[in-house]
Amino acid sequence: MINITTSFPNKTAAAFHKHVTGSEVASAMFPEIAGSIVALFVDGNLQDLATPISKDGSVDPVTIESNTGMDIIRHDAAHIMARAVREIFPDTKLAIGPTIENGFYYDFDLSHSLSEKDFEAIERKMSDIIAKDERFVREVWPRERAIKFFEDLGEHYKLEILSKVPLGEEITVYKHGEFVDLCRGPHAPSARYVKAFKLTKISGAYWLGDQKNKMLQRVYGTAWHSSEALASYIHNMQEAEKRDHRKIAKDLGWFHIQNEALGQVFWHDKGWVIYRIIEEYIRCKLKKHGYLEVKTPIMLDRKLWEKSGHWEKFKENMFVVEDDKKELAIKPMNCPCHVQIFKSKIRSYKELPIRMAEFGMCHRNEPSGSLYGLMRVRGFTQDDAHIFCTHEQVRDEVLRFYELLMEVYKDFGFDSVTVKLSDRPENRIGSDEIWDRSEQSLMEPMNALGVQYTINKGEGAFYGPKLEFTLKDSIGREWQCGTVQLDFVLPDRLGAYYIGEDGKKHIPVIIHRAVLGTIERFIGILIEHYAGNIPAWLAPVQLEILTVSGEVAEYARDLAEMASQENVRVELNAAEENISHKIRKAIFNKVPIVWVVGKSEAGDRCVSVRRYGSGETCRMAAGKALKTLLTCVSMR
């Protein structure tokens, strides 16, 4: 007999015969939810319900509605789609079919050029396969059998994958009816757990992401635990498409990106206004919270990057140039530069903490296929800062940073923020005592403030734990922006020290921290969060004055001057155009406040006020309208 324990929903234990299946354990220990369980965590490892459990251990259920459960049924759907495509197009060769956020894809090599017109036939075939409700069966094969099987099928992509599996490592396949795929799993017990699915798009993808390899056809899809969940997801995706920051910015003339500078932004005048407002806003917050703003070089000698460790771990993502036979790298991050400023003179413990901030222009050689508007670029500005402090000061610095972070997010209109703590990985440096203290330094401020957080077990960097802060936007999408990362390694590698109270040299802790992440990406998030209708305090044009006729142009110019003197960003449209056309144009440009001026308004020294999103017009004395406007544009 073996003993199985669980902590779900309360700590319990039960005895089972040796080699009991996960399905039997699920039925016995979790009878109320057994029908929705698709897999188990056994001693922290995910496995399917058919796999035997042969020793004492702990289990936790994975339900279909959970994130892990959804990932499993999307994996099922990827296999079902591959089976369907091969049944429709028998010459299909299979490459890879992983899950991704909210979905899955599979890469195919076939003579037929797939298009969205094929989706109906593929989805119908998938539905037929699901209706059979055949089981997913895991088998462990000898390497020779696997090679022979895929050779006979001419599946050269699978053979290439097999060739990279280390000798001695277990090779597993999953059978589904007559369909067999090389796969680690796990899968749900059978196809019926794929309750709702939809194919979404097609793209090209080089095998293994290498442009030297063949271009394959990648079919994307999504799968959910219910038709209602699928419908909700599709609605959100349609809403997200309407909010696409690239389209909105193009319509409004805020920025563009072109092939001659992939991953780099051409900011137009109005977009640059938004950028500078955000930068200045953060600058004021930094000053208030005791940061020193610095500026460091954009390009540094290879030797510094070797010392910092970035050359070894990050070289592929760095842009490297040669000058007088020296290799220089355009900086992908600011931290080594800030250490140079810290160590430019002897520091005393009395100076700590030193909070050093920079709007640092960084560059990373991201793959061209991963670039996406402002969300993933090659050239970007980090709202980056590094706090040099003692171990004893970390807790208070994290507390102060959290207060700053929440002030900023609230001002930008984000109320839902989740926190994750990534703790010590298996491969790490530093003693357990240092890690204990460091993790406590991150947890204690959150506990003191009553902030709930989840733990990403083992996901910290080798040089220290971190907190990640994730925003939820207006349509429920999550965006990880803020970070607090402790670092014991970099100051030591680069020779940073301070003189302690004991008169000896001590290595400071560096806290890497960011609020927005990058300004570019944060602007993209803002555009999509507000669907382009950004708050008046951020709007590049806060007020537009529209004339009904040329007779009131002088009065309109006086109004524009009056608003401009109060630092309102104002534009005057006195063109000889129909007023309805002018209003439609202002609405299209998402101007927060519009003043319409005709003969009547000029005679009474009034304006007719229109707010974006409201079809109503309110007549108001010019002075009162300005006062109301100033209140509106100052609200955060």
Swiss-Prot record:
Protein function: Catalyzes the attachment of threonine to tRNA(Thr) in a two-step reaction: L-threonine is first activated by ATP to form Thr-AMP and then transferred to the acceptor end of tRNA(Thr). Also edits incorrectly charged L-seryl-tRNA(Thr).
Subcellular location: Cytoplasm
EC number in record: 6.1.1.3
Keywords on record: Aminoacyl-tRNA synthetase, ATP-binding, Cytoplasm, Ligase, Metal-binding, Nucleotide-binding, Protein biosynthesis, RNA-binding, tRNA-binding, Zinc
Keyword presence, Manganese: no
Example GO biological process: threonyl-tRNA aminoacylation
Cofactor: Zn(2+)
Pfam family, one: tRNA_SAD
GO cellular component, one term: cytoplasm
Top EC class, one word: ligase
Cofactor binding comment, as recorded: Binds 1 zinc ion per subunit.
Protein known as: Threonine--tRNA ligase
Single annotated GO MF: threonine-tRNA ligase activity
Family from the record: Belongs to the class-II aminoacyl-tRNA synthetase family.
Catalytic activity as recorded in UniProt: tRNA(Thr) + L-threonine + ATP = L-threonyl-tRNA(Thr) + AMP + diphosphate + H(+)
Major subcellular site: cytoplasm
Keyword Secreted included in the entry's annotation: no
Region Catalytic: start-end pairs: 244-535
Domain of life (superkingdom): Bacteria
Residues at which Zn(2+) binds: 335, 386, 512
Assembly notes: Homodimer.
